[in-house]
Amino acid sequence: MALETLTSPRLSSPMPTLFQDSALGFHGSKGKRSKRSRSEFDRQSLTEDEYIALCLMLLARDGDRNRDLDLPSSSSSPPLLPPLPTPIYKCSVCDKAFSSYQALGGHKASHRKSFSLTQSAGGDELSTSSAITTSGISGGGGGSVKSHVCSICHKSFATGQALGGHKRCHYEGKNGGGVSSSVSNSEDVGSTSHVSSGHRGFDLNIPPIPEFSMVNGDEEVMSPMPAKKLRFDFPEKP
């Protein structure tokens, strides 16, 4: 069909008016009309190659025109996209909102710090109250709480350490400390208790033996503080 159309006698006929304007643009410069009159083209006839080239040129020009209509103008601004929703991070303790997870983490760290300070303050108050209670029990002596009782004098103590120290006093008194204290309390013995405190195994009810010192060979002098005067029995004269 295309060959028959190309070889038809209408090709030798003068070019229609529609193709004359296109032929002007084809032979001359683009966008400018030739100065030659239209009658000159009417008298000319197109060859087969020129006709095919003219048809292709018209088709290409028509396609470019439709493409320009479909494309939007470059001067128009692109459509604005809606802003993305900002993520919100809320604190589970005080319900405060933050824009980032890092800010929320720093805020939670302050909560943990304040909680640790409060807990340590509560522990200090508890230890102080327990110390006051212990001191009150040990100062009272005869309080209602008797956790540690001495088996010798039946005194009560708040802690086992205090009871151990108290029993140590009992043991040291048996070894020699108690002898010195009992001798010092007696009125009859007086200052001789300091001399006799180092001796062991004697009865306190028996008065001490007076001490004598030799002065100038034969003179006997009694101690300055005798416990009791000695009596001498002399035989009667006949």
Curated annotation (Swiss-Prot):
InterPro entries named among the record's database cross-references: AZF1/2/3-like, Znf_C2H2_sf, Znf_C2H2_type
Zinc finger feature spans (C2H2-type): 89-111, 148-170
Intracellular or extracellular location(s): Nucleus
Coarse class of the protein's main subcellular location: nucleus
Inducing factors: By cold treatment and during Pi starvation.
Family annotation (SMART domains): ZnF_C2H2 (SM00355)
GO terms for biological process, alphabetical: cellular response to hypoxia; phosphate ion homeostasis; regulation of root development
Compositional bias of kind Polar residues: 1-15
GO MF entry, a single one: zinc ion binding
Keyword field contains Cytoplasm: no
Function: Probable transcription factor that regulates root development and phosphate (Pi) acquisition and homeostasis. Probably acts as a repressor of primary root growth and regulates Pi homeostasis through the control of root architecture.
Miscellaneous section: Seeds silencing ZAT6 fail to germinate. Plants overexpressing ZAT6 have retarded growth with smaller primary roots and fewer leaves.
Protein name stated in the entry: Zinc finger protein ZAT6
Organism: Arabidopsis thaliana
